[in-house]
Amino acid sequence: MNALELINIGETELRQKKIESFRLDSELLLSKILNKKREQILINLDQKISQKKFFMYKRLIQRRSKNEPIAYIMEEKEFWSKNFLVNKDTLIPRPETELMVEKIIEIFKEKRISILDIGTGSGCILISLLSELNNSKGLGIDISKKALIVAKKNSEKHKIQSNIKFLNKSLDAKFNEKFDLIVSNPPYIKS
């Protein structure tokens, strides 16, 4: 079986399950299995796929067909032009959150500030801000120790370790230090 045939199989299954981005998702899942960029696969659709990779791909297609978010299956999500690790212990960054990051950078772009990120999750907001606001520092807090592990990995991945800390604290935690900016983007509550 080649890459095109496998993508078509995945596309058919996802379409039948009413997954809107059936073609893109089937291509992305194959890129994960083959550990290649999607574009590399698309220019070499006749490449042969092993039976082992076929079964791995089918498992990912099954997860997606049950409406598991593609970001959790891929274990990453792009935010502020960077790829962030995500998993079920973190929320998936939303595109509209980038508007908040953009506004904050506009306001503080020439300043050195101290930032508190409440409910940091994957750390994407704080890491994105610190990558743009030179010499600023940040503290990300979260009640989930597992989310903080992901946030720390993301800070290492994006080389923002020297001016960032993560602590397992709740919203009502007290801090000795003062912050110039407090950010938070908690999950939406369904009404």
Model-based region annotation:
Residues M1-Y57:
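A short N-terminal interaction module
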Residues I7, S26-E27, Y57, N67-I70, ...:
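A general structural signal for well-ordered alpha-helical segments in protein cores
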Residues K32-E106:
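Conserved AdoMet
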Residues E96-S191:
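Conserved SAM/SAH cofactor-binding pocket of Class I
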